[in-house]
Amino acid sequence: MSHRTPGRPAAVAVAGAMALLLAACSSTAATSAPPAPTSTGAGVALVGAPLEVPDGLDVAPFDEPREVQVPDGWSVSLWARVDAARLAAWTPDGRLLVSRPKQGDVVLLSPGEGEPASTTLLSGLEQPHGLAFAGSTLYVAQSDRVDAYPYDAGRVGDPRPVADGLPDAKSDDLRGAYAHALKSVAVGEDGAVYVSVGSTGNVSEEDRSADPERATVLRVPPGGGEPAVFARGVRNGTGLAVGPDGSVWSAVNNRDNIAYPYDRAADGDGGSDQGEVLDAYVADHPLEPLARLTQGRDLGWPYCNPDPDAEPGVPGSPLVYADRPFVRDVQTNADGAELDCDALAPVEQGMGAHSAPLGLSFAEDLPGPLGDGALVGIHGSWNRQPPRPPEVAFFPWRDGGLGDQQTLLGGFQDADGARWGRPVMAVQGPDDAVYVTDDAAGAVYRMVPPAR
C-alpha cells in the first residue's frame, strides 16, 4: 500500500439544531388492525403503525399500504427515495449524506418542508461506502482507499488521501474475486482513523497471511501514517463506530455453513456428527458479533467461532448472545493448532446467526426506557430457514458496555418470508428523530419518537 499523511482531524462536532421537518399533508397508510405487541425486552413493546407515505413517493414498494413495528408512540414516514441507499452520516450543518456504492456516488439530502432536496455531493468514486465526520472533515471509504474532504455548506474541497492501495477486486492476487470489498470508516476521539477490510470469501484462510492482511480493522494514527492492523479475524465488519466512551465497536457478518464441532450426536441417529454440516445447527451458529475492538484483538475467524449455546452442542440449547466464548472451527482448526480459541476474549454482545448486521451508530437519550445505545441496521438472512427478518436493532449502553438486542423498527418481512424492505443503517438526527436507509426499497425512513 502507499499512504500519505493527513492533517490531524478536529474533534467530532455536535451537529447544530436543524429546522423542524414538517410531515407531508397527504399520505397513504395501512388501515388493517395492528398485530399484538411483541416484547423486545427492557419493558419495551412493539405495536403496529402505518408507514406514512407522502404523495409523489408512493411507487413500489410503497404503492400499497405498509405497516411497521415500533415502540408505542413512535411514528414512521417515508422521508426520501434514494436508490440503493447504504451507509449514512450527518453533516455539521444538519444535512444527511448517503452512500451508494453501485452508483459510485454520495447523495446529500437537505431537510426542509416535506421531501428533502437531493443533490450529488461526490460522484465517480469506486464503490463509496463508509462515511464519517471529524469536525468539518468528511472521511469517505471507497473499496480501495480512504480520503478526507474539507466540508462546508453542502460542498467539499479537494480530497486528501488517508490510506490507499487497500485490497479490492482489482488487487493482483485476487483477480476480481472479492466477496466483501466494501469498506467502512470511523474516526476516534484522538483523530485516529479506523477502516474495515473484509474477507475475500466465506472461509478464506489466506486472508490472514495476505499483505495487506484482510478480515481486519486497520488503524491510521492521528496525524497520518502507515495503516496497521488494529483487530484481526473480523470476517466482515461492516458496522464500525466509536462509542460514547471513545471505544471502537464493530458489528460483524460471520461465516456461513459451519460444521458441527462436537464429537457427539446432534441429529438423533446416535452416531457422532462432528464435522457434518447440519441445517439445524447452521441456522443458529455462529452468532454475529457486536464487539469492542482493542489493539491486537482477534475475533477468531476463520479458526474460532463465537458460540451462542448455553449448553454447548446440545440440540435445542437456549441461545445466549452476551459474553460468549469461542469454539474451534472443526473445518479449519480441528486440533487447535492454528489458533487457541480458549485464549480469545469472549464476544461482548451478539445477534442471531445470519442476521447480516450492516450500519452501526450510537444514539443519545432515546425516550422511555431506551436511553443511550447502539443502533444496528440488520439486513436479514439470505440462507436460513425460516429467514431471519430485517430490522433496526437497539442495544442499550450500560456501564461502558452494550445490553441485549431490542427491536426498534421491524415489520419488513411477511409471514411467508417475503420482504418489502431491508434496513442498512440507522442514525440519530439533530432533531432527535432516527433516520433509516434501506437499499432494497430505495428509501430513507424517518422515525419520530413520542413527545417527552
What are these regions (language model features)?
Residues 21-24:
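C-terminal motif of bacterial Sec signal peptides marking the signal peptidase cleavage site
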Residues 26-28:
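Bacterial signal peptide processing site
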Residues 33-69, 182, 200-202, 215, ...:
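Beta-propeller domain segments
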Residues 82-93, 123-141, 171-192, 232-247, ...:
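Beta-rich, blade/repeat-based domains predominating
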Residues 97-99, 140, 193-197, 249-252, ...:
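Residue position within the beta-strands of beta-propeller blades
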Residues 100-102, 143-145, 151, 198-200, ...:
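Short loop/turn segments immediately following the C-termini of beta-strands
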Residues 127, 144-187, 199-202:
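Asp-box/WD-like beta-propeller blade repeats and closely related beta-sheet repeat scaffolds
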Residues 427-452:
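Blade-level signature of beta-propeller repeat domains, shared across WD40, Kelch, NHL, RCC1
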